[in-house]
Amino acid sequence: MLQTARQDQEVLVEMRNAGVHRSGRWLVRGVDLTVRRGEIVTLIGPNGSGKSTTVKMAIGVLQPDEGAVRRMPSLKVGYVPQKVSIDWTLPLSVERLMALTGTLDRKKVGEALEAAGIAHLARAEVQTLSGGEFQRALLARALAREPDLLVLDEPVQGVDFTGEIALYQLISEIRDRTGCGVLLISHDLHVVMAATDTVICLNGHICCRGTPEKVLKSPEYVRLFGARAGDTLAIYHHHHDHTHLADGRVRQADGTIVDDCHAHHHDHARDGGQGGGGHGHAG
Amino acid sequence: MAARVVGGMVMLDDFFTRALVAGIGLAMVVGPLGCFVVWRRMAYFGDTMAHSALLGVALSFLFEINLTAGVFVVAALASLALLFLQRHGTLSTDALLGILSHSTLALGLVMVAFMSWIRIDLMAFLFGDILAVSRMDIAMIYGGGALVLLVLAWLWRPLLAATVNPEIAAAEGMRPERARFIFMLLMAAMIAIAMKIVGIMLITSLLIIPAAAGRRFASTPEIMAIAASIAGAIAVIGGLTASLQFDTPSGPSIVVAALILFLLSLVRLPWRQTAPLNTGGKI
């Protein structure tokens, strides 16, 4: 029901067949992706599968070399990149970091810090924060902007397991409260948010996509997580049965080479043990 | 006899005052720019731009154009050449800087040697001649310097955002590439203005040492910029006074004074809280 309601929501970002080409190879290619207001889209996939590249295209940090990316006019983005390193010589408190790209209301800054659970660190210098604290500070900064689109590249880095669950719950709450769209990257194949509306698996291209409900039925999910974290965690488990070649073509499990992999099909609900020639990233 | 001494004092007063006024003016401009050079880890980059100034000097004499304009254009072109080579070359930035820095300096020296019809005081360009500063030079420093500071104030937020993280800046509409380009132009302008005062070889030290000395007293980027300006001004006053007292060259004396300030800033005073605050626990 919610799903159909969302179809009417304003489109924040729309990518059509988008790809980025660098040093003679495609980092990612043929990406079709839409994020609407109030929708949470999660990208998963192994290292080097083009998740960060896709996200950077979506928000205009990278320009696509083919295909098209369309953003809502005057789209306000809140971005938490994968890695931020700030030189020690730059004196920057958490509070000051909040106003990095725009002046903010003092109250909103306080609320965002509170929501991220680091209100007590408002005056601390960012270089003194632990990895998890800094990640929360970056999240608070993105939240305080009250963005239309919240973009998070592996937001749980350096955060322990309980912190991870709390952080995903927080992101889901924010979506519910503000109605923003969320584009999320998770490198962990076993942990994606139950609140996610769409899961997209990347591996140089879009391998598959679907609702997490489909994924929740998977027997592996029940075996690994049980009912314990059923509201928050889901497992997304499948085998890749094809290999991506350097020129962008695809070698399938039976050895045939095709131009792309949209022709075949992944089944998430079953254990795809038949994928002999693939690069399985199911753990 | 008595009249001559009085006359001498007046003259001394005059050129010394001019040197002080010029040096303090320059320090105020260089402080905030120097902070960005330190934060962005661009010390060697600044050095390269400064070295290219000698090529600018030679070309200005060759084509009989305004010296300041010639130096500005060549320094700006050197920074553009570097940006281009960084994107399209295979050499590391470090190696590129080494090549550009010393080849532009050498080219300048060779060209000056060829132009036997002009007598050029190389030492004045390499190490500065602050005691020969004219009223026109002072007008140039204050006029040009005010313009540089105004543009920097206008550019402050995008440039700081790009310094912290260019991807966040790009995603949130701060246009980091443009900010970086304008910052290069400001650097080139500052080098053109500063050359006569401290000389090509020592400009970078005036950029970096006062900023480094100011770091310990700063809790925000803005305070550090002001602290760097003040530290620079103190170095100018101290260096020039010492140069008059001990008959040492003015440019190097200013740099030595700045170095002493920096070393003093490293001393931990028991009554001053110098360590960055970290009030929070770890996640």
Swiss-Prot record, chain A:
List of residues binding ATP: G45, P46, N47, G48, S49, G50, K51, S52
Listed Gly residues bias regions: 272-283
Protein name per its UniProtKB record: Zinc import ATP-binding protein ZnuC
Catalytic activity: Zn(2+)(out) + ATP(in) + H2O(in) = Zn(2+)(in) + ADP(in) + phosphate(in) + H(+)(in)
Region (Disordered): 264-283
Pfam families to which the protein is assigned, alphabetical: ABC_tran
Known function: Part of the ABC transporter complex ZnuABC involved in zinc import. Responsible for energy coupling to the transport system.
Signal sequence bounds: none
Annotated family: Belongs to the ABC transporter superfamily. Zinc importer (TC 3.A.1.15.5) family.
One GO BP annotation of this record: response to zinc ion
Keywords for this protein: ATP-binding, Cell inner membrane, Cell membrane, Ion transport, Membrane, Nucleotide-binding, Translocase, Transport, Zinc, Zinc transport
Nucleotide-binding is among the record's keywords: yes
